Amino acid sequence: MSLNFLEFEKPIAELEAKIEALRDISRRGGDNALDLDKEIKQLEDKCLDLKKKTFSDLGAWEVAQLARHPERPYVLDYIELMFTEFDELAGDRAFADDKALVGGMARLDGRPVMIIGHQKGRGTKEKVRRNFGMPKPEGYRKAKRLMQMAERFKMPIITFIDTAGAYPGVGAEERGQSEAIATNLKIMSELSVPVICNVVGEGGSGGALAIGVGDYVNMLQYSTYSVISPEGCASILWRDSDKAPQAAEAMGLVAPRLKELELIDTIIDEPLGGAHRNHKATAENIKQRLIEQLNELEGFDEEALLERRYQRLMNYGYC
């Protein structure tokens, strides 16, 4: 069970703490233990009802907080839970290996695929090493190299998007951050193999879009996808980042709204309480959807696949 609770989850946290305390009393009592099963069951039922009520009516700001939860699964977690025979590939063959973006070959249900995804890292040292999941140009050029390799070997491409955005540092801009992102957009629109993109946490601006052009774009239930963070939007519009909750509601960054606008194709359910509550169940939900979509896309020849992707992209912005 997660030890990190968000502000709106505090009533749930208090109930779970009471349940754990009663269980502890029952365990330590030995032969003289009090029979607390009835009380524990009542609290468990109450906690379940509270979770259902809380998560059935989340606002955009609450979803944005869930998308950033520190215990949410990242691409390396999904690789371990969903794929076999993963072989990581490093470097852009020009400048460096960007640890904020992970990629390599693997098998999904026996089928060879290329995986590319943002990795935020856990713990201070790992977060710094991964640059908090914000790739530099060399990261996106690594992604380009792997996508072109996948095309040569006729391997479907699966991406996992979870970034606050592309790294905005001076060095990154000097090395051509915008060019690297733009090049990926062009290449992904022309790839002759199936491409499935999955927003599994934060989908932040061009940093997300640089590995987000595909035949299918899926979003986890409590992920976000937007041109800017709610805090950034609030700072620009109202000069006050404390108005981020209002900005989040106005931006339409949640999966149902994006599905309504046909900017994404599928919303993948998360376990009650969010993906961080059950990594395995979340991975299984994604895996099943990927298998279904790959089975469909592999029925298209190259010309039909590219035409389908072209029509999908041309529909953007149509209301």
Swiss-Prot record:
Write down the InterPro entries for this protein, in alphabetical order.
Acetyl_CoA_COase_a_su (IPR001095), ClpP/crotonase-like_dom_sf (IPR029045), COA_CT_C (IPR011763)
- The residues covered by the CoA carboxyltransferase C-terminal domain are 35-296
Upper classification of the source organism reads:
Bacteria, Pseudomonadati, Pseudomonadota, Gammaproteobacteria, Vibrionales
Role according to the record: Component of the acetyl coenzyme A carboxylase (ACC) complex. First, biotin carboxylase catalyzes the carboxylation of biotin on its carrier protein (BCCP) and then the CO(2) group is transferred by the carboxyltransferase to acetyl-CoA to form malonyl-CoA.
Question: Biological process GO annotation list?
Answer: fatty acid biosynthetic process; malonyl-CoA biosynthetic process
Report the main location listed first in the record.
cytoplasm
Q: In which pathway does it act?
A: Lipid metabolism; malonyl-CoA biosynthesis; malonyl-CoA from acetyl-CoA: step 1/1
Alphabetized UniProt keyword annotations: ATP-binding, Cytoplasm, Fatty acid biosynthesis, Fatty acid metabolism, Lipid biosynthesis, Lipid metabolism, Nucleotide-binding, Transferase
Organism expressing this protein natively: Aliivibrio salmonicida (strain LFI1238) (Vibrio salmonicida (strain LFI1238))
Q: What is the official name of this protein in its record?
A: Acetyl-coenzyme A carboxylase carboxyl transferase subunit alpha
Catalyzed chemical reaction(s) = N(6)-carboxybiotinyl-L-lysyl-[protein] + acetyl-CoA = N(6)-biotinyl-L-lysyl-[protein] + malonyl-CoA
